[in-house]
């Protein structure tokens, strides 16, 4: 499968059957806020964690998805979500 439509279809199918993805890097203050929320809610198993500083492939994926490397970025079946406060609010609404 190729092209934009094929890639987006794969993306939706992948996220439907797999964990959410969190693009982050360790020393990002905003990322730490989201990571602490995930730990507090005990939902780490719901995620694939992608540290963009450890693996440059993840940074490229993030650029392909959003046009930049701003983290944290939560990716779920609805697409990418940025802003730590929005991500935290979403997680609490879904898992509390």
Please place each PLM-identified region on the residue numbering.
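Thiol-based oxidoreductase modules, predominantly thioredoxin-like and allied folds used
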Residues: 45-58
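Non-catalytic, surface beta->alpha helical segment in thiol-disulfide oxidoreductase systems
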Residues: 76-96
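Short amphipathic alpha-helix with an adjacent loop that forms part of the alpha/beta core around
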Residues: 59-65
């Amino acid at each position: 499968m190729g092209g934009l439509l094929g890639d987006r279809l794969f993306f939706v199918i992948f996220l439907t059957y797999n964990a959410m993805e969190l693009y982050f890097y360790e020393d990002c203050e905003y990322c730490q806020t989201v990571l602490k929320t995930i730990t507090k809610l005990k939902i780490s198993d719901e995620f694939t964690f992608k540290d963009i500083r450890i693996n440059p492939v993840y940074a490229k994926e993030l650029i392909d998805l959003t046009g930049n490397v701003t983290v944290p970025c939560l990716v779920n079946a609805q697409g990418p979500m940025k802003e730590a406060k929005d991500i935290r609010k979403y997680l609490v609404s879904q898992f509390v």
